[in-house]
Regions:
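Short mixed-charge
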Residues: 78-98, 172-177, 382-424, 473-477
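Alpha/beta-hydrolase-fold serine-hydrolase catalytic core, especially in secreted/extracellular enzymes
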Residues: 243, 256, 411-478
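Catalytic-loop region of hydrolases
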Residues: 1-57
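Alpha/beta-hydrolase fold nucleophile elbow
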Residues: 141-155
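Gly/Ala-rich beta-loop-alpha elbow adjacent to hydrolase catalytic centers
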Residues: 106, 152, 156-160
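N-terminal cap/lid subdomain of alpha/beta-hydrolase-fold enzymes
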Residues: 37-124, 375-378
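Accessory cap/linker subdomain of secreted extracellular hydrolases
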Residues: 11-12, 57, 65-81, 85, ...
Length: 478
């Protein structure tokens, strides 16, 4: 059966190098139901050749809901990298499969090449569907008893706790031996009506003010919004250590919609403003995946996963005819029926049963700002207490990388990359130079965080060398 999923390591269109052993295709949720309307998840699996990672399996989800994890594989943490604005794919020195077996899954059903009739009404049902499917994948590749680590970004802030809790609730280490989780710039467990994003915005704006280049008259509007609704005062009152007891009153936004006023002027000043990475400016760069912030496909261009030879190599289905980075609906009625209280319980289960959960937050992300995440954390309860009890103060340190002329395509920054703080089995880290997709914008930072979750390095606060050589070789030793 494995041969049916085997992906040739060479000869993938546009990829001019050996990507190593991998397997891809669809596996049904139920082997007895394999018709065109029956649910099947699409995955791409890269086994590791690192002896230290043979018993570790990392699952990666992108967000949305309905955004493809093939985006994560191709532009963030997979073996080959084709980031927007670049000429062609290159080997990714920061590929996560250098540390563990990694499986990128298009989740939920209705995303990308994961096809079938959408029946899930909420995240509990999508997680249950995934858990059922996961057993089939484990049996297909003989992954019984492996240690599982669930990772992702954005709306995967919902996926990861729901899937993790559903697996842990099974109490079956043969198939669901969950040992930790790592996810980035996530949707956090709080009600939208709290409007924590508004309370976090003034500080975010001040941090990036020189980048935004907003005219003085517009800055006065933002200042008035802040003053009228007490946004800084709310943040100062709630982003404390320890925090005030939850539940909290919502942020006042009536008559002072600060983010709407910012949105009105930001794209006038910078028409190419990228909500996922605020340092971006014009021109809009061609993205072979047609994403993220400003979708632009030059005439005659084809998205990478719509190239016939690529689809053939990875055993993609004939439908959908046009793959897209984000698709859907993935819930019945296109409504996830989000329940923040339930989400918090899933988060608690994941943390309390693994004591190995980390959230990373890119400080150049406007969609979910770092202080929005920090505020949300202070409103959550886990392992007997609410929020962090002491203020984050430690520096998040990444070993300095040897950037040379021979590895320009993988140049990346090291040294102090942000902050990190841990209490009661949960860690929050910020990454100064990253936007929404930390493995894309700051790959060494994400690589380091994965090393730490897997137990390969002891600390995120010193420059202990990486556990593997950083090179573009996928053969052991690297």
């Amino acid at each position: 059966m494995l041969l049916a999923y085997y992906v040739p390591s060479t000869g993938i269109p546009e990829v001019s190098f050996d990507i190593g052993e991998s397997y891809a295709g669809q596996i049904p949720v139920d082997w007895k139901k394999t018709g065109s309307k029956d649910p099947k998840f699409f995955y791409w699996f890269f086994p590791t050749v690192n002896p230290a990672g043979k018993d570790d399996v990392v699952i990666w989800f992108n967000g949305g809901p309905g955004c493809s994890s093939l985006e994560g594989l191709t532009q963030e943490n997979g073996p080959f990298s084709w980031k927007y604005g670049t000429y062609k794919p290159v080997p990714n020195a920061w590929s996560w499969h250098k540390l563990a077996n990694v499986i990128w899954v298009e989740y939920p059903i209705g995303t990308g090449f994961s096809t079938g009739h959408v029946t899930a009404k909420n995240n509990t049902e999508t997680a249950a569907q995934f858990v059922e499917w996961w057993k089939n994948l484990v049996d297909t590749f003989g992954l019984q008893g492996k240690k599982l680590y669930i990772t992702g970004e954005s709306y995967a802030g919902v996926y990861v706790p729901y899937v993790g809790a559903a697996m842990l609730d099974k109490k079956d280490k043969k198939y669901f031996n969950v040992k930790g989780a790592l996810y980035y710039d996530p949707v956090m467990p709080y009600a939208d009506k709290l409007r924590l994003d508004h309370a976090a915005f003034p500080g975010f704006f001040r941090h990036w003010e020189s980048v935004f280049a907003i005219p003085d008259k517009n800055k006065k509007i933002l200042d008035n919004d802040n003053e009228k609704c007490g946004l800084d005062k709310y943040r100062e009152a709630h982003l404390t250590y320890p925090p005030p007891p939850a539940p909290w009153k919502p942020v006042q936004v009536k008559g002072c919609d600060i983010t709407a006023h910012f949105d009105e002027i930001s794209t006038v000043i910078n028409p190419c403003f990228n909500v996922y990475h605020v340092q971006d400016t014009c021109p809009v760069l061609w993205d072979v995946l047609g994403f993220p912030s400003v979708q632009y496909t030059p005439p005659g261009a084809t998205l990478f996963f719509n190239i016939p030879g690529v689809r053939k190599a990875i055993h993609a289905p004939a439908a959908p005819k046009e793959w897209a980075s984000c698709s859907g609906p993935v819930f019945v009625g296109d409504d996830d029926r989000y329940d923040p209280a339930e989400h918090e319980k899933k988060f608690q289960t994941l943390v309390e049963k693994t004591n190995n959960v980390m959230i990373g937050s890119g400080m150049a992300d406007y969609i979910i700002t770092s202080n929005t995440t920090a505020l949300a954390v202070q409103g959550l309860k886990w392992n007997g207490k609410q929020g962090f009890q002491t203020a984050p103060s430690a520096e998040f340190v990444v070993p300095i990388i040897n950037n040379t002329e021979s590895n320009v395509e993988n140049w990346a920054g090291g040294s102090v990359q942000g902050s990190v703080h841990s209490e009661r089995g949960f860690t929050l880290a910020t990454v100064k130079t990253s936007g929404h997709m930390v493995p894309q914008y700051a790959p060494p930072a994400a690589f380091r965080q994965l090393e730490h979750m897997l137990g390969r390095v002891k600390s995120l606060t010193d420059a202990e060398p990486f556990s593997v050589n950083i090179s573009t070789s996928f053969k052991w030793p690297y």
